[in-house]
């Protein structure tokens, strides 16, 4: 009995270390996410498995055009997947309401790529930055669609002018 207890006691630091490493990795560096609706099609399809990284959110490294996971403003238990279209200080055209909206300090504007099937900032307005969870870094599944998400043309920077 004593040797069993001693054996378990020797393994506890390794188990605690492993659990701590896994927690920190998934909490601060990367994790897995699954898109559960059609609002981001064709970029991300219903059921796609993606690699997500909270690092970009935690260090405020997001850019317009990034796809993000965010807590729903209507149901904090629900997580939504949308494209970051506007950041603080931006003016965004809301085609649902037919006018421009200003994104205040500490807020973001999210929209789905599949606009006809997306409930997003066009419906509920700008969101607090604090609702962001992570950036979608890579599509993992299905294998035939594996890869980085392409940034739509409207978010790409024009090439520098040559003189």
Residue map of PLM features:
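Juxtamembrane cytosolic face of transmembrane helices
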Residues: 34, 116, 120-121
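Protein maturation boundaries and topogenic segments
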Residues: 1-79, 99-102, 131, 137-163
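Short coil-to-beta-strand transition motifs
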Residues: 77-87, 125-127, 131
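Short beta-strands and strand-coil junctions in structured, solvent-facing domains, enriched
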Residues: 58, 92-93, 117-118
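Short, conserved beta-turn/loop elements at beta-strand boundaries and strand-helix junctions
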Residues: 88-94, 138-142
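A membrane-cytosol interface segment of integral membrane proteins
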Residues: 101-102, 108, 126
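Phosphate/adenylate-binding glycine loop and adjacent helical scaffold
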Residues: 112
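Residue-level marker of beta-strand positions
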Residues: 49, 67, 91, 107-108
């Amino acid at each position: 009995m004593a040797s069993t207890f001693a054996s378990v006691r020797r393994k506890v630091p390794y188990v605690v270390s492993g659990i701590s490493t896994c927690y920190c990795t998934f909490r601060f560096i990367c994790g897995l996410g699954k898109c559960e609706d059609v609002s981001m099609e064709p970029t991300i399809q219903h059921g796609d498995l993606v690699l997500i990284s909270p690092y970009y959110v935690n260090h405020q490294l997001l850019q317009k055009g990034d796809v993000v996971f965010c807590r729903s403003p209507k149901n904090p238990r629900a997580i939504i997947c949308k494209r970051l279209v506007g950041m603080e200080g931006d003016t965004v055209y809301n085609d649902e309401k037919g006018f421009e909206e200003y994104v205040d300090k500490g807020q973001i504007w999210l929209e789905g790529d599949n606009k006809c099937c997306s409930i997003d900032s066009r419906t509920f307005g700008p969101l607090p930055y604090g609702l962001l969870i992570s950036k979608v870094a890579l599509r993992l599944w299905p294998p035939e669609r594996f890869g980085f998400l392409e940034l739509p043309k409207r978010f790409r920077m024009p090439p520098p002018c040559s003189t």
